Amino acid sequence: TMVTVWKITEELKGGLFALILSATAVTFSALFRLNTLFQPNSLDVLCWTLLYYTLIKYVNTSNRKWLWALAAVFAIGFLNKYSIAFLVVGLVPAILLTEHRKWFAQKNFYLAAVFTLLLISPNLIWQYQHDFLVFKHMEELRITQLVNVNRLDFMKDQLLYFMGGLFIIVFALFAFVVYPPFKKYRFIPLSTLFTLLLFVYFRAKSYYAIGLYPVLLAFGAVYLDYLLSSNWKVYLKPVAIVIPLLLFIPVLRIAFPIYPPAEIAAQRDLYQKYGMLRWEDGKDHELPQDFADMLGWKELAHKVDRVYSQVKDKKHTLVICDNYGLAGAINYYSKYKEIGAVSFNADYKYWFNLKDDITTVISVKNAHNEDIENKGD
């Protein structure tokens, strides 16, 4: 993502200061917290940023190869995580409101759309064969998690992801209005607005929108490079670069798992203030959910191994878990590589061995909730 932001900054004719500023703002942000999690979000943000990059290149060159590149980027992003579709839905009205609405009358635009459909068709066919499970999943997500999302908290969280680069984003939004070279890119802030409105309406999790901001950091850095390029203002350039570094310090403390669980629990008020203790159930817990989910994986696998070792007929034994996280942890850390833990959650439901009869079942339950009594092993 950082490299893509660098390339966008170059495409916007930003100088060395703009390149360093945009890269610094991306690097020293909560964005890299996503890389600590075994989730598709890192690639998701990269695809969002790359999609904007291909659009910017197409605006500047009108070369149809960038439409094909856009199609490929969207397809990769879609196959990784469906949320990139929200970005495209936000882009459509944004483009229609600018002079680029002419794209919708071009043959190459629709050829690229067909190319996209071909690339994602295996997934669409699979969804069709399984009665479009994505909609069932979204409904389950809405009922169990998104119903607990506070829309005001969603908007407040947007300010925290790039706290050190927030001033850069503000300058970017201002530049789209007053800076003539950016006039042709006004569909970008409009797409940000429309996509955010979509997420607010559907009560999306706040991090879903994080991919909207890297491109804005590039625009803001280029505009600041222009503003600070003469007279005494050039001396403000080092200050602008230092700001993201300084403001990253409190973000590092809160957003990254650099402290042991006991110390995080001891600073409950601080983490609660920034909503870090709020879980998907809408309640505050002792630890941030992403960090809590990582704890005890090895211990869990060892406990299951102790039980599994006592089973004589392992071939006809089923280890079934409450969710894919538990199943994945057991399969990864267990000393029994054939243990094959499964779950009715996510893709694991398709990995059950239905060839052999089951005589023994080991059930692994989720005991995260504080109202569940700890009954030992």
Show which residues each predicted segment covers.
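Hydrophobic/aromatic-rich transmembrane helices and adjacent perimembrane loops
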Residues: 187, 197-232, 236-237
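Short acidic/glycine- and proline-prone juxtamembrane loop motifs at membrane-interface regions
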Residues: 30, 36-44
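Transmembrane-helix signature of polytopic, membrane-embedded enzymes
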Residues: 5-27, 45-46
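Signature aromatic-anchored transmembrane alpha helix within multi-pass, membrane-resident enzymes
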Residues: 227-268
